[in-house]
């Protein structure tokens, strides 16, 4: 053996080669051990994780089943309450029986889901059932819901009315949370109208209220919708404005000192021969455009002796750059635009309810231009209506104003001028006949209540009023119009009427 060993030739390169091979084998051996360890660990983790997630999935599934069972129990209780409510339903609530045609299904299922969400939200706010209390462990988990069901009749009543309101006003909401918030806004307004209408005829109240397309607005949305009227600098007024009496004297209609005592007791331009049905500005703050275009439409028809024709409010929104589009404006600047450009037909430049990036008036035929802008003082309104016709005015629109449904408005007004409308007439009526106007569609029961409430008063007292055309569609107010209280001379400035009055001169 020693002889064999002695015969081996141990060169330096050979020794180095053996060392390298040995090192390589050791490294590979360690790698193999690590790989095996990692593989075993991964397999173990995978197995453990699979077992865990499988068990967790089972737990979640069981929780989901429990939650679904709980929700079904709660909705079953709600359905019982709803059925009891249906037994005492009146004509106003018949909508509960009708199908609510939208993607979410029929009215009853939608109503139940909304009531369930509402009830759950209320339960979270005032939780009288402590589930962590040992003494409550064996109590039915629907206890807290049944505890609050006694008060659900009112919610069912208001919710059924809200669903009817949604359908009538084509309301669609993003999700149930928004729908519940809109419901709360609606309920506040609905209760306000009911309380107001109970008092109609008392304390001088001569108008009734009703929920409408704005009744689901929040207070912030109300404030954003009504923008302060843009002011007009004196240099523009002096350049373009012609005072009413000067205009009438120039056209030989009257002498400059003509007095209002010569005028009739009433003047009404609401006839179909003067106007198309009132239009709807939608959620765009473009009342100034509708007032100005409405004024121009009357002037165009009256001057040319034609039937009513619709002109473009959208052109004013897009092209009258002195105004702020859907963020407010002033009819004066719309008339100023008409002086320099002309007006498009409504069919050629239709209303969109929002401001476009570009003015597209090159696409339409520009018809008659305005040459000057007339100005009316507060004590000249009756004179203006008799000699030149309708005029644009500004009012201080308030929540009372928005909820107006019929009668002669004498409610609270906003001290700030924030809404442009068209003054189309004036009149007077005995107090007992305040709701007998042919344009009024007030419920006969409210008229009866009004007459009962004014008993003992001097029902022969005369109520004087303005007739105003709004831009909230024909379903608002009295066919799209509102009658606003005034004094006999028409110069009291109630609700801002008379503070900012213009008309176009053709």
UniProtKB/Swiss-Prot annotation:
<keyword id="KW-0325">Glycoprotein</keyword>
<protein>
    <recommendedName>
        <fullName>Vinckepain-1</fullName>
        <ecNumber>3.4.22.-</ecNumber>
    </recommendedName>
</protein>
<feature type="glycosylation site" description="N-linked (GlcNAc...) asparagine">
    <location>
        <position position="258"/>
    </location>
</feature>
<keyword id="KW-1015">Disulfide bond</keyword>
<feature type="propeptide" description="Activation peptide">
    <location>
        <begin position="1"/>
        <end position="262"/>
    </location>
</feature>
<comment type="similarity">
    <text>Belongs to the peptidase C1 family.</text>
</comment>
<dbReference type="GO" id="GO:0008234">
    <property type="term" value="F:cysteine-type peptidase activity"/>
</dbReference>
<dbReference type="InterPro" id="IPR013201">
    <property type="entry name" value="Prot_inhib_I29"/>
</dbReference>
<feature type="disulfide bond">
    <location>
        <begin position="319"/>
        <end position="359"/>
    </location>
</feature>
<feature type="glycosylation site" description="N-linked (GlcNAc...) asparagine">
    <location>
        <position position="133"/>
    </location>
</feature>
<keyword id="KW-0812">Transmembrane</keyword>
<feature type="glycosylation site" description="N-linked (GlcNAc...) asparagine">
    <location>
        <position position="418"/>
    </location>
</feature>
<dbReference type="InterPro" id="IPR025660">
    <property type="entry name" value="Pept_his_AS"/>
</dbReference>
<keyword id="KW-0788">Thiol protease</keyword>
<feature type="active site">
    <location>
        <position position="470"/>
    </location>
</feature>
<dbReference type="Pfam" id="PF08246">
    <property type="entry name" value="Inhibitor_I29"/>
</dbReference>
<dbReference type="GO" id="GO:0016020">
    <property type="term" value="C:membrane"/>
</dbReference>
<dbReference type="InterPro" id="IPR000668">
    <property type="entry name" value="Peptidase_C1A_C"/>
</dbReference>
<feature type="disulfide bond">
    <location>
        <begin position="413"/>
        <end position="495"/>
    </location>
</feature>
<keyword id="KW-1133">Transmembrane helix</keyword>
<dbReference type="GO" id="GO:0006508">
    <property type="term" value="P:proteolysis"/>
</dbReference>
<dbReference type="Pfam" id="PF00112">
    <property type="entry name" value="Peptidase_C1"/>
</dbReference>
<dbReference type="InterPro" id="IPR039417">
    <property type="entry name" value="Peptidase_C1A_papain-like"/>
</dbReference>
<feature type="transmembrane region" description="Helical; Signal-anchor for type II membrane protein">
    <location>
        <begin position="33"/>
        <end position="53"/>
    </location>
</feature>
<keyword id="KW-0645">Protease</keyword>
<keyword id="KW-0472">Membrane</keyword>
<keyword id="KW-0865">Zymogen</keyword>
<feature type="disulfide bond">
    <location>
        <begin position="284"/>
        <end position="326"/>
    </location>
</feature>
<keyword id="KW-0735">Signal-anchor</keyword>
<feature type="active site">
    <location>
        <position position="287"/>
    </location>
</feature>
<feature type="topological domain" description="Lumenal">
    <location>
        <begin position="54"/>
        <end position="506"/>
    </location>
</feature>
<feature type="active site">
    <location>
        <position position="419"/>
    </location>
</feature>
<dbReference type="InterPro" id="IPR025661">
    <property type="entry name" value="Pept_asp_AS"/>
</dbReference>
<dbReference type="InterPro" id="IPR000169">
    <property type="entry name" value="Pept_cys_AS"/>
</dbReference>
<dbReference type="InterPro" id="IPR013128">
    <property type="entry name" value="Peptidase_C1A"/>
</dbReference>
<comment type="function">
    <text>Cysteine protease.</text>
</comment>
<dbReference type="InterPro" id="IPR038765">
    <property type="entry name" value="Papain-like_cys_pep_sf"/>
</dbReference>
<feature type="disulfide bond">
    <location>
        <begin position="344"/>
        <end position="364"/>
    </location>
</feature>
<keyword id="KW-0378">Hydrolase</keyword>
<feature type="topological domain" description="Cytoplasmic">
    <location>
        <begin position="1"/>
        <end position="32"/>
    </location>
</feature>
């Amino acid at each position: 053996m020693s002889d064999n060993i002695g015969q081996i030739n141990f060169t330096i390169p050979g020794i180095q080669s053996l060392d390298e091979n040995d090192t390589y084998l050791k490294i590979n051996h360690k790698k193999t051990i690590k790989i095996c360890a990692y593989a075993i660990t991964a397999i173990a983790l995978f197995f453990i994780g699979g077992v865990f997630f499988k068990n967790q999935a089972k737990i979640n599934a069981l929780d989901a089943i429990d939650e679904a069972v709980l929700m079904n129990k709660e909705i079953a209780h709600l359905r019982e309450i709803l059925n009891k409510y249906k037994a005492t339903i009146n004509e106003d609530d018949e909508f509960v029986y009708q199908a609510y045609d939208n993607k979410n299904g029929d009215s009853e299922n939608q109503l139940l889901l909304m009531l369930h969400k509402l009830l759950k939200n209320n339960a979270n706010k005032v939780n009288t059932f402590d589930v962590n209390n040992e003494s409550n462990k064996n109590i039915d988990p629907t206890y807290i819901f049944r505890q609050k069901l006694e008060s659900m009749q009112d919610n069912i009543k208001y919710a059924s009315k809200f669903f009817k309101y949604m359908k009538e006003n084509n309301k669609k909401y993003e999700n149930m949370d928004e729908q519940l918030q809109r419901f709360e806004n609606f309920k506040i307004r609905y209760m306000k109208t009911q309380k107001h209408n109970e008092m109609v005829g008392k304390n001088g109240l001569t108008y009734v209220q009703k929920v409408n397309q704005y009744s689901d607005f929040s207070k912030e949305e109300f404030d954003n919708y009504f923008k302060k009227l843009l002011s007009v600098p004196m240099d523009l007024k002096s350049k373009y404005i012609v005072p009413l009496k000067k205009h009438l004297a120039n056209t030989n209609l009257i002498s400059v000192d003509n007095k209002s005592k010569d005028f009739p007791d009433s003047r009404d331009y609401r006839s179909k021969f003067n106007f198309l049905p009132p239009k709807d500005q939608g959620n765009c703050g473009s009342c100034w455009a509708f007032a100005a275009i409405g004024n121009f439409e009357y002037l165009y028809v009256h001057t040319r002796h034609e039937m009513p024709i619709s002109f473009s409010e959208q052109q004013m929104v897009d092209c009258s750059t002195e105004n702020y589009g859907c963020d407010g404006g002033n009819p004066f600047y719309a008339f100023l635009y008409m002086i320099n450009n002309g007006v498009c037909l409504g069919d050629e430049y239709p209303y969109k309810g929002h401001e476009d990036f570009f003015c597209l008036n090159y696409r339409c035929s520009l018809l008659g231009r305005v040459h000057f802008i007339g100005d009316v003082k507060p004590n000249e309104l009756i004179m203006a209506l008799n000699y030149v016709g309708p005029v644009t005015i500004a009012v201080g629109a308030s929540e009372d104003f928005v909820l107006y449904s019929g009668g002669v408005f004498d409610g609270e007004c906003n001290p700030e001028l924030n809404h442009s409308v068209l003054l189309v007439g004036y009149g007077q009526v005995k107090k007992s006949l305040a709701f007998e106007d042919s344009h009024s569609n007030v419920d006969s029961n409210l008229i009866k209540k009004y007459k009962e409430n004014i008993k003992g008063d001097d029902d022969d007292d005369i109520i004087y009023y303005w007739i105003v055309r709004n831009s909230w569609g024909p379903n608002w107010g009295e066919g799209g119009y509102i009658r606003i209280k005034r004094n006999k001379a028409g110069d009291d400035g109630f609700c801002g009427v008379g503070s900012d009055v213009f008309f176009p001169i053709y």
